[in-house]
Amino acid sequence: MAATEHRGLSGGDYNVDLLPIDQDDSPPSSWRLSLDTFRLPSSSPLSSGRHNGRTRLSRYLRTPKKERKVSEYYKQQEKLLEGFNEMETINETGFVSGAPTEEELKKLAKSERLAVHISNAANLVLFVAKVYASVESRSMAVIASTLDSLLDLLSGFILWFTANAMRTPNNFRYPIGKRRMQPVGIIVFASVMATLGLQVILESTRLLVSKNGSHMSSTEEKWMIGIMASATVVKFLLMLYCRSFQNEIVRAYAQDHLFDVITNSVGLATAVLAVKFYWWIDPSGAILIALYTISTWARTVLENVHSLIGRSAPPDFLAKLTFLIWNHHEKIKHIDTVRAYTFGSHYFVEVDIVLPEDMRLHEAHNIGETLQEKLEQLSEVERAFVHIDFEFTHRPEHKCKV
């Protein structure tokens, strides 16, 4: 390749123009993008080894806000370079570095199922205990927390059902898999939680208007405090345990346990304060718990809706894909399109590459198929589609139907 020659990348979704390759930095026969040309400047906060505090750039920056933005920019660049290194490893070895073996995946799946079973068993036991505390205390805040535990059981069933459904594929009825069942199940569960939260708000408001507070004896108060405090501790430990996993369903349990820690703490505090000081603290606490539940799961619904409607991947991920594609094979003359979008919890990737017009079919097929296999090895990618063309001056061949 000549010293000033470079291959072009363009497309409606992602455009990149590479700089000419310098003869002094790269051998004439090199067609790959070299990571040696991508390095942080010596004056950057990260390259100087000082990630926090003031750096030598501070003399040029008048405000801490500007310095913070520069530091965040270099951190983002460092993360991008780490992604390029990962793509380079895939191109050199043919597989993802550090990818777990089949035996390790089986052990991980077994431990994830154990985490789900432990969470479901704990939710059932704590729900029964909190029902008793609700009956004895008649506290709206405790009742709101108990309803949240009931929803934990419902969510556990939904998440278990979706996880079990995804483990039993049916290539005839569901040719692209059942991964979409997970966000759909979470959306259904969140909708139920929001509905019950609204009922708690209405009942608590009725108590505030009627000025009818609950009363409990010292024995009932001790039972209520013991049950709610124990439930909070158990949920906190389960949250730490489930957060150690990367599986989306187990992490959804971790999020649910965190919500319970907050709602149990608020419910316990407001119930005790209502007994010691003012009766209206209890229904007010119940309203706070319900509002928190509704707002939290509303955000969860939005996140899962975005994952189902085909939202584009961030530019950094598209840049990683482009780097991987460009260094895949010497015969790739142009990258016409790099597109990645959500369709569930993972990305679908569409790539258009340009190969020589006179290339034999079997050679072009092998280049495209091996590239597809590399893309599908990425943990973020569920499926990849590689389209092969011999020119890139045409208009887009696929249009979205409205």
From Swiss-Prot:
The membrane spanning regions, by residue number, are 115-135, 141-161, 183-203, 222-242, 258-278, 285-305
The UniProt keyword set, sorted, is: Ion transport, Membrane, Transmembrane, Transmembrane helix, Transport, Vacuole
Per the record, which residues fall in region Disordered? 1-21
| A single GO cellular-component term on record | vacuolar membrane
Instruction: List localization entries.
Output: Vacuole membrane
Query: InterPro entries per the record?
Result: Cation_efflux, Cation_efflux_CTD, Cation_efflux_CTD_sf, Cation_efflux_TMD_sf, CDF_Transporter
Q: Which GO terms describe its molecular function?
A: monoatomic cation transmembrane transporter activity
Would you say which domain of life the source belongs to?
Eukaryota
Q: Which residues form the signal peptide?
A: none
**Intervals, Vacuolar compartment:** 136-140, 204-221, 279-284
Q: What residue ranges lie in the Cytoplasmic compartment?
A: 1-114, 162-182, 243-257, 306-402
Bilayer topology: Multi-pass membrane protein
Pfam families per UniProt: Cation_efflux, ZT_dimer
Instruction: State the family named in the UniProt similarity comment for this chain.
Output: Belongs to the cation diffusion facilitator (CDF) transporter (TC 2.A.4) family. SLC30A subfamily.
**Briefly, what is this protein's role?**
Involved in sequestration of excess metal in the cytoplasm into vacuoles to maintain metal homeostasis.
By what name is this protein known?
Answer: Metal tolerance protein 9
What species is given as this protein's source?
Answer: Arabidopsis thaliana
Q: Which gene encodes it?
A: MTP9
